[in-house]
């Protein structure tokens, strides 16, 4: 219980943590169902907290991959991922924090693009982020 109070866990994570202590699989499922019923554990809450904490540094592809690894359903993942505008804003912030200025040549642009792709941003979002005017306060547009 102490561990659950400190941070949200997915059902799959909790299952893995409790499995060594369970007598059998049925008992473990009963406990997990009770936790969900009492709202002590919620995959939806876990997914929202996870996306909220990581979305400013990572793109949708990476978030989706990590959430799948935590055993979260595709429906919950799809509902929790940031909008295209939010993701573009995050990609611009990540690029500016890392590189401080726009690419001066093709090699620098490739390096910046690889960095954003590694962070899980789609190629379209990464290209739009690198094309954004670095001097503007809000450098994205809604058609992005």
Language-model features and meaning:
Residues 1-144:
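An alpha-helical, amphipathic repeat domain used for nucleic-acid recognition
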């Amino acid at each position: 219980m102490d561990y659950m109070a400190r941070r949200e866990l997915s059902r799959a994570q909790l299952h893995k943590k409790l499995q060594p202590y369970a007598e059998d699989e049925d008992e473990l499922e009963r406990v997990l169902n009770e936790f969900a019923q009492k709202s002590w554990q919620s995959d939806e809450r876990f997914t929202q907290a996870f996306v909220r904490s990581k979305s400013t540094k990572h793109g949708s592809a990476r978030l989706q991959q990590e959430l799948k690894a935590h055993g979260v359903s595709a429906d919950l993942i799809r509902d929790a991922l940031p909008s295209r505008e939010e993701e573009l804003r995050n990609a611009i912030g990540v690029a500016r924090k890392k590189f401080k200025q726009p690419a001066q040549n093709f090699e620098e642009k490739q390096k910046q693009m690889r960095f954003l792709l590694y962070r899980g941003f789609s190629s379209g979002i990464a290209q739009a982020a690198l094309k954004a005017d670095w001097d503007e306060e809000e450098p994205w547009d809604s058609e992005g």
